[in-house]
């Protein structure tokens, strides 16, 4: 009934750790069982760890969705990979399931916003709706210390803001989440929290420009 009443609505979730994404996408699939879902993931990590090891957790949602048959690996684009956190077995799994991996280095060569626009265009050609998941650890530690896995060398705030404006403008984007923002680890000036709020507002601004 809710789906029928709000069929044109955009769902937005501000979550805890990244495990919530698996639950959210399963819910989308339940609501739209005949539709093909694509995922644009802005993240430092692949999040394809095996849940059989320690159970469903922060690093397992993408694998849960692929192994559960909710999303095809070929319908997932990850932009923002950097650092030394994606071990070979995880990369091998991603390659085996045809996940498109765009490192932050390569995204910057092409232009981060252009890389995001290309991913949205590519996904929209083959899926019915796009789910965007924004892991705040994709940001550089200097602007986002309040995340579980803060790292140097990540996205700048302006790169994320500009990307989210384009994401909000794209008609195939129907769902978005912002995850891994931990205020208890934030700085005294709450820069991660403020950056997260501005990121969400940029997405909303993009929606208004559709």
What residue spans do the PLM features occupy?
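Conserved alpha-helical scaffold segments that buttress catalytic/binding sites
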Residues: 1-210
């Amino acid at each position: 009934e809710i789906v029928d009443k709000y069929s044109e609505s955009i769902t937005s979730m501000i979550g805890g750790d990244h495990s919530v994404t698996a639950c959210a996408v399963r819910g989308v699939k339940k609501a739209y069982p005949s539709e093909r879902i694509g995922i644009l993931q802005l993240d430092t990590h692949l999040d394809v760890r095996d849940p059989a090891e320690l159970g469903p957790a922060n690093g397992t949602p993408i694998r849960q969705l692929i192994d559960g048959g909710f999303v095809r690996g070929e319908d997932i684009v990850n932009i923002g990979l950097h650092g030394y956190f994606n071990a070979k077995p995880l990369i091998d799994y991603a390659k085996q399931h045809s996940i498109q991996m765009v490192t932050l280095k390569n995204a910057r060569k092409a232009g981060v916003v252009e890389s995001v626009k290309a991913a949205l265009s590519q996904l929209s050609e083959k899926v019915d709706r796009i789910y965007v998941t924004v892991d705040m650890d994709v940001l550089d530690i200097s602007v986002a210390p309040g995340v579980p896995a803060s790292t140097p060398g990540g996205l700048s705030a302006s790169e994320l803001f500009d990307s989210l404006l384009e994401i909000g403008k794209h008609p195939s984007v129907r769902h978005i989440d912002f995850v891994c923002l931990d205020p208890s680890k934030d700085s005294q000036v709450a820069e991660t929290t403020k950056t997260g709020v501005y990121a969400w507002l940029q997405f909303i601004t993009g929606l208004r420009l559709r």
